[in-house]
């Protein structure tokens, strides 16, 4: 059993992990961006440390800051929650190199399944039925062409997304055109990966 676990996340998932850790008699360590100082996950934790000001990339996704806090405060495990660094194999390897347990999948499992487009390719190779879709798309015009071939509505998806973040239903070419930059930007800010692809969307499936 661990003695002290850092929760590398915020919001509802961080409060749920904190509640479970307290039930198990394990100290919960919260981290927070300055803008989240008054958040519930901060006040509920046994210890809480500020990651500074700035975007998610500068705070919750800043591995150097997180590792420094873990080592400084004697953390022996980290729970990533969902989103953020939860599917980042480099973060897991960094934890392992420092003797800090990562509560989650291995780097190898993440490399295989952490990116939706690679998981989709693996599923195709093994004969799993899938909705029509694309590989990674880097060009908006290619995305618009692919969507026309697949047929609207489609879902524009972040390959690295998690927790429902980085998905946008596009009913037509205009909505896909508008969603393209925003979904990629959201993905880059939350997952440090702006890769996107398209799948056919089935309403009320």
Question: What is the predicted function of each stretch?
Answer:
Residues 1-205:
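N-terminal beta-alpha lobe that positions the nucleotide/phosphoryl donor
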């Amino acid at each position: 059993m661990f003695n002290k676990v850092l929760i590398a996340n915020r919001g509802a998932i961080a409060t749920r992990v904190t509640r479970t850790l307290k039930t198990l008699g394990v100290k919960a360590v919260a981290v927070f961006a300055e803008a989240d100082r008054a958040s519930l996950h901060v006040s509920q934790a046994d210890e809480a440390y500020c990651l500074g000001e700035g975007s998610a990339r500068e705070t919750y996704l800043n591995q150097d800051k997180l590792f420094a806090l873990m080592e400084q405060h004697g953390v022996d495990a980290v729970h990533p929650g969902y989103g953020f660094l939860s599917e980042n194999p480099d973060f897991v390897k960094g934890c392992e190199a420092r003797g800090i347990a990562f509560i989650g999948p291995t780097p190898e499992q993440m490399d295989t399944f952490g990116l939706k487009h690679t998981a989709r390719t693996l599923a195709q190779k093994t004969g799993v039925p899938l909705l029509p879709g694309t590989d990674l798309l880097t060009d908006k015009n290619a995305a618009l062409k692919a969507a026309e071939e697949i047929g609207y509505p489609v879902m524009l998806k972040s390959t690295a997304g998690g927790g429902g973040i980085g998905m946008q239903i596009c009913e037509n070419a205009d909505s896909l055109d508008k969603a393209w930059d925003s979904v990629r930007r959201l993905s880059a800010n939350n997952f440090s990966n702006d890769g996107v692809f398209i799948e056919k969307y089935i309403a009320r499936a």
